[in-house]
Amino acid sequence: MDRLTVRDLSPEEKKVLVRVDFNVPIKDGKILDDIRIRSAMPTINYLLQKRAAVILMSHLGRPRGSGFEEKYSLQPVVEVLEGYLGHHVPLAPDCIGEVARQAVAQLSPGRVLILENLRFHRGEEHPEEDPAFAAELSSYGDFYVNDAFGTSHRKHTSVYTVPQAFPGRCAAGLLMEKELEFLGTHLLISPKRPFTAILGGAKVSSKIGVIEALLSQVDNLLLAGGMGYTFLKALGKSVGNSLVEESGIELATRVLQIAKQRNVRIVLPVDAKVAKTCDSGVSWSEVSINQGIPADLEGLDIGTQTIQEFCKIIDASATVFWNGPVGVYEVPPFDQGSMAIANCLARHPSATTVVGGGDAAAVIALAGCSSQVSHVSTGGGASLEFLEKGFLPGTEVLSPTRG
């Protein structure tokens, strides 16, 4: 890794400003999934062991950017964090201003402070509108640490502008380091082969960049979900009422041509679970893609033969990357394909298996397999952009390693 990590710093008795990603799902004031909080704990605990004063900053949701909104407060996060740390964690009522400055000034070594939601200020998402916002955040710390991989593809103030005020003193956190190790070293730089990528989700256009990048890396590319039907239609198959991105058909044709030139095997569904709607309890059946999906039905999941074929390829692979569900996993039985892939990855411990955040990470969690794959990324969009470009705005501004 060519950037400093938190282990390269000397944070003893110093204030360390840490950008974390605590953008967790909350309902009725309760956190539904705290994986992002748990994922940040190694960095937080490391700094506390070093007797640093740790100042955490994060966004949550999409507030208007015009001041405090209770439903977007980080208070529920504080309660979970206190449980993991075993001691009180103060929440500054704002991330800038006199109350924030006082909270930072009073913070002792070996303790943690959380600043209130960064997005209560427009300056977080629009750095050009409020340079003073970045300047004040930058004034809080002696060092800066970015452990928010999931937001590092955005040029927001806290991940892109603030670290530039810490030349030689801004570093990757332990979670960020792990993300870059798996997505960079294990997937882009030196993947074990055969290398298989599985891409699902709705649109070809939203993933065309990463698809084209992966065509330079992988041996097998398995395509399903909504984008799978777009590829099938590009090949002249009858896909009925299935989700098809008409504007993506030309892109799909181009991808198929590039794959052929680069000797990459593209594998598409050979059968599908179909129904008139994706409502729970709806009557469904399986049909062969060669026979065609009837005009009044839509493909909602990969079929039994496709599951077997996909799993056979996964079992024979040494590296596997998965992003995007292959069916409507929220509605049984159209979750069977995605669940089968999750379980297939979990029973393949000899391979490097990386799940690219987002819905695929949700499927892995539902299947109870998160701990049985090599790495579950905390960033959906960030992981795809990193695979496409090989860097993120938030990682490029971290201090390079010395020498």
UniProtKB/Swiss-Prot annotation:
Keywords (A to Z) from UniProt: ATP-binding, Cytoplasm, Glycolysis, Kinase, Nucleotide-binding, Transferase
Metabolic or biological pathway: Carbohydrate degradation; glycolysis; pyruvate from D-glyceraldehyde 3-phosphate: step 2/5
Keyword Nucleotide-binding included in the entry's annotation: yes
Places the protein is found: Cytoplasm
Positions annotated to bind ATP: K207, G299, E330, G357, G358, D359, A360
Pfam family, one: PGK
Molecular function GO terms recorded: ADP binding; ATP binding; phosphoglycerate kinase activity
EC numbers for this chain: 2.7.2.3
Catalytic EC class: transferase
Catalytic reaction(s) noted: (2R)-3-phosphoglycerate + ATP = (2R)-3-phospho-glyceroyl phosphate + ADP
Zinc as UniProt keyword: no
One GO CC term on file: cytosol
Family matches, as InterPro entries: Phosphoglycerate_kinase (IPR001576), Phosphoglycerate_kinase_CS (IPR015911), Phosphoglycerate_kinase_N (IPR015824), Phosphoglycerate_kinase_sf (IPR036043)
Organism domain of life: Bacteria
Primary location group: cytoplasm
Amino acids binding substrate: D21, F22, N23, R36, H59, L60, G61, R62, R119, R154
GO biological process, one term: gluconeogenesis
PANTHER family xrefs: PHOSPHOGLYCERATE KINASE, PHOSPHOGLYCERATE KINASE 1, CHLOROPLASTIC-RELATED
Family: Belongs to the phosphoglycerate kinase family.
Subunit description: Monomer.
This protein's name: Phosphoglycerate kinase
Originating organism: Chlamydia felis (strain Fe/C-56)
